[in-house]
Amino acid sequence: MQMKKCPKCGKYTLKEYCIDCNEKAGTVKPPRFSPVDKYGKYRRMLKKSLKK
């Protein structure tokens, strides 16, 4: 059993479909960690520009 989140209303459920809006719920697991970060350069640039 995995926790799922409705993409339409944002509510969490353990069922396949949301009980409120009957939309198919998706997984809420974060993406797998990889030491080869394809977007790390862009995240650091954004973080640096937001500090200013």
Swiss-Prot record:
InterPro entries: H/ACA_rnp_Nop10, H/ACA_rnp_Nop10_sf, Nop10_arc-typ
GO cellular component: ribonucleoprotein complex
GO MF entry, a single one: snoRNA binding
Keyword set includes rRNA processing: yes
SUPFAM superfamilies: Nop10-like SnoRNP
Pfam family, one: Nop10p
Keyword rRNA processing recorded: yes
Family stated for the protein in its record: Belongs to the NOP10 family.
Free-text function comment from the UniProt entry: Involved in ribosome biogenesis; more specifically in 18S rRNA pseudouridylation and in cleavage of pre-rRNA.
UniProt name for this protein: Ribosome biogenesis protein Nop10
Organism: Methanococcus vannielii (strain ATCC 35089 / DSM 1224 / JCM 13029 / OCM 148 / SB)
Name of the gene: nop10
